[in-house]
Amino acid sequence: MPSYELALVLRQLPRPELISVIRRTAESILDKGGIIRKLENLGSRALPHKVSEHGVVHREGTHFTIAFDTAPTKIADLKEEFGRDIDIIRRYIFKVEEPEQKPCTLHEEMLPPAYRKDVQEIIAAAQKKQKKKFNYNSGLDYYPFQK
């Protein structure tokens, strides 16, 4: 199952109601067969601009991120369900890309440039690429336009 991150902006709520909204959100992820990896509260902040959602204008919100794994077919259902929730102002689901694993090449990079494999490849490519000389192909063994 791929990893996803849900960024939520909730309306200003008292703590008990805030907990019930987060619980409701987490249960909907679990009901769809997801696995919650991390829940992070980013705190209450003023929104960058006023946001109108479900007929109410919001200027402040509580921000949360939830890292979870679920099947890609369930993402549309989650977006639709979160869109109907009146306590959620904004919701964004991002697919988390796994970081590319690069092998350690420190022992090769510590070699002098003449011994490095990538430098040798560059030198070999430069030697292969030589400027082509124009061939006249006139059939004559002399150049007739010479003075």
Curated annotation (Swiss-Prot):
CDD domains, A to Z? bS6_mito
Compartment(s) where it occurs, according to its Swiss-Prot or TrEMBL record: Mitochondrion
**Which Gene Ontology terms cover its molecular function?**
small ribosomal subunit rRNA binding; structural constituent of ribosome
Where is this chain primarily localised?
mitochondrion
Q: Which Gene3D superfamilies match?
A: 3.30.70.60
Q: Which family does it belong to?
A: Belongs to the bacterial ribosomal protein bS6 family.
- Identification of the protein by name: Small ribosomal subunit protein bS6m
Q: Which organism is it from?
A: Drosophila melanogaster
Gene this protein is translated from:
mRpS6
